[in-house]
Amino acid sequence: MMKYRRFGKTDLEMPVFSCGGMRYQHKWDDVEWKEVPVEGQKNLEATIDRAVELGINHIETARGYGSSEMQLGPVLNKFRRDEI
């Protein structure tokens, strides 16, 4: 069972583990969607699915992580906002 802690002085509950997105990207550079390997995207989706299953609802990414944001978009879109 995932443990959660209050985030700073807010009422938000954050999991003690987060899913860091630095290595989710296909490349460090911006790429066309068609360049992302299907197997790599399936692996990313399975990773996020399992993380959410385990109660990890903090998934971070950054503009500097290449194609990470583009690849996470379709995966995160399938979850309700209150799940992540």
Which residues does each predicted region cover?
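N-terminal binding-site loop/beta-alpha segment at the start of enzyme catalytic domains
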Residues: 1-84
